[in-house]
């Protein structure tokens, strides 16, 4: 409850840490077990802690307490009925998941961070079952594929290459949907990423294993499917509840620009399945044409 949350806000601990860290020249504050080795090694080697290490530990304390305060204000904001859509001061916090081998290009360093709030249905919640570590471009492209998948409440398979949809299939089964997605562009799908909101079974896995794919994401892989797909050493298999169509509460699109940050609402307007479109020509589309248009409308929104 709200009252329990308020009761659990720690006042003394952060105050003690901040006071000690302020006096870092004379006090060593170690809040992260990962730093124990560094401190012990210095003590063993010199009998003291260097000023360089003290200042590093000082920074770690204020980083930690700042994150703690940010999480409190985010919770309090989530409890407001009249919270401003775009607050005057925007404070966000993320936790590092992993450092990448490189970024978008080999000469760029990069890391992946996760939101500390609700991440259900998003990449940070995925469980990697097989394959190499995800790269910067892998994560970026897979996220784009998952955003397109959210448009569908029926069984669908999305194939993405270099951030762009190259195949989409909608059918009664994942196997049929994959066949349609593959046939949309058999050339571009090679080396691409495939995501689905249905279970990958043996029949689907057999089809998928015939070509080189970077990543496959699904809410579930059968044991038979895993036995087939894990024969490919470098293929990444991610298990994620892709049936979740709603974005986490309060999710916003943030885009860094030099000297600032652009923030906007998620574009989660889904085209109605009943085709709520006004035809302004004398020629009326057939039911099949309208069905195709509805599918194309969803896809083109995610084309770059």
Language-model segments: which ranges?
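Active-site loop-to-helix "anion-binding N-cap" substructures in soluble metabolic enzymes
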Residues: 1-80, 172-173, 198, 255
């Amino acid at each position: 409850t709200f009252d329990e949350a308020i009761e659990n806000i720690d006042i003394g601990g952060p105050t003690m840490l901040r006071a000690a860290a302020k006096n870092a020249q004379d006090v060593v504050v170690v809040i992260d077990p990962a730093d124990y080795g560094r401190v012990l090694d210095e003590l063993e080697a010199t009998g003291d802690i260097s000023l360089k290490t003290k200042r590093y530990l000082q920074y770690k304390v204020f980083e930690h307490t700042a994150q703690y305060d940010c999480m409190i204000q985010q919770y309090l904001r989530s409890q407001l009925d009249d919270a401003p859509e775009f607050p005057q001061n925007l404070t966000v916090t993320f936790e590092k998941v992993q450092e990448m081998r490189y970024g978008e290009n080999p000469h760029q360093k990069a890391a992946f961070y996760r939101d500390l709030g609700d991440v259900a249905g998003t990449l940070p919640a995925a469980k990697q079952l097989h394959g190499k570590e995800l790269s910067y471009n892998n994560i970026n492209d897979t996220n784009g594929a998952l955003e397109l998948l959210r448009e569908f409440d029926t069984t669908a398979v999305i194939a993405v290459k270099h951030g762009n949809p190259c195949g989409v299939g909608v059918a009664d089964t994942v196997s049929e949907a994959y066949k349609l997605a593959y046939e949309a562009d058999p050339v571009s799908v090679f080396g691409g990423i495939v995501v689905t909101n249905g279970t990958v079974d043996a029949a689907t896995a057999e089809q998928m294993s015939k070509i080189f794919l970077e990543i496959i994401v699904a809410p579930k892989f059968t044991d038979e499917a895993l036995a087939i797909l894990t024969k490919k050493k470098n293929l990444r298999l991610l298990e994620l509840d892709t049936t979740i169509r709603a974005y986490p509460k309060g999710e916003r699109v943030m885009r860094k620009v030099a000297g600032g940050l652009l923030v906007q609402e998620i574009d989660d307007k889904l085209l109605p399945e009943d085709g709520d479109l006004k035809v302004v020509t004398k020629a009326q589309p057939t039911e099949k044409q309208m069905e195709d248009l509805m599918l194309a409308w969803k896809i083109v929104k995610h084309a770059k």
